[in-house]
């Protein structure tokens, strides 16, 4: 899909009373089937090249996206907000998206930290009208420190979850992700991108491009959303 076929509407909404307004982008293909509320990762905002590329691939699959900034990123800081602010921002973003998406089926998630914060928000209190969660590289543990505690709250999430994980992701050992998904039962779907790292970058010797990996991920989101 070309940029001319994708409608991008810049918006602002109140993240929290304390933090004030943040920016958002509603990107809508000509005939969307659903909407993904899509949060950025810890180190880069909603217009990072990964976010832009993934939005384009999702649009090719008929999926509109509602991207937004967390307050710290809006303010130009590199240090993430305290967790209560991050979680409140997720709830505010979902509520705002629900008001502008014309009743389309709604999903939520994000890249790395954005997906994790979305899942924590859903575990604390259901996200109204959200049918499922999408994680682009769920950060299960710090690099080099395999652990599973960051996934414990997922047991309290009651809606379907799609995990998109790379085999070279140093923040999510597949030997830990797989049993976690098994514990979650039918709520969890795991798709593994062969050769991809945490940024879904693949080495040249893999024989494919980063763009092809993102296309693969978008197809998975599309097929999963139909069933959720």
For each predicted feature, which ranges?
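Short beta-strand/loop motif that positions the catalytic acidic residue
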Residues: 156-158, 163-165, 169
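Catalytic histidine neighborhood in serine/cysteine hydrolases
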Residues: 183-201
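Catalytic active-site module of serine/aspartate enzymes centered on a nucleophile-bearing elbow/loop
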Residues: 204-228
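Serine-hydrolase catalytic machinery in alpha/beta-hydrolase-like enzymes
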Residues: 13-106, 200-210
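Glycine-rich His-Gly loop
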Residues: 38-42, 112, 166
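Primarily recognizes the serine-hydrolase "nucleophile elbow" in alpha/beta-hydrolase
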Residues: 90-159
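Conserved alpha/beta-hydrolase "acid-adjacent" motif
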Residues: 170-176
């Amino acid at each position: 899909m070309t940029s001319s076929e994708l409608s991008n509407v810049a918006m602002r909404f109140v993240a929290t009373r304390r933090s004030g307004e943040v920016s958002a982008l509603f990107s809508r293909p000509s005939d969307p089937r659903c909407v993904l509320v899509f949060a950025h990762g810890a180190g880069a905002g909603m217009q990072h090249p990964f976010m832009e590329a993934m939005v384009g691939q999702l649009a090719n699959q008929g999926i509109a996206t509602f991207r937004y900034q967390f307050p710290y990123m809006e303010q130009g800081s590199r240090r993430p907000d305290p967790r209560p602010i991050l979680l409140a921002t997720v709830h505010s973003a979902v509520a705002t998206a629900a008001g502008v998406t014309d009743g389309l089926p709604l999903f939520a998630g994000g890249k790395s930290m954005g997906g994790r914060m979305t899942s924590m928000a859903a575990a604390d209190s259901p996200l109204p009208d959200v049918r499922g969660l999408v994680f682009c590289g769920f950060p299960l543990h710090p690099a080099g420190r395999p652990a599973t505690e960051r996934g414990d709250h997922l047991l309290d999430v009651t809606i379907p979850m799609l995990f998109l994980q790379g085999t070279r992701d140093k923040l999510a050992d597949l030997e830990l992700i797989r049993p976690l998904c098994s514990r979650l039962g039918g709520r969890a779907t795991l798709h593994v991108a062969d050769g991809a790292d945490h940024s879904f970058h693949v080495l040249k010797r893999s024989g494919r491009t980063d763009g092809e990996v993102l296309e693969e991920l978008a197809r998975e989101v599309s097929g999963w959303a139909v069933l959720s």
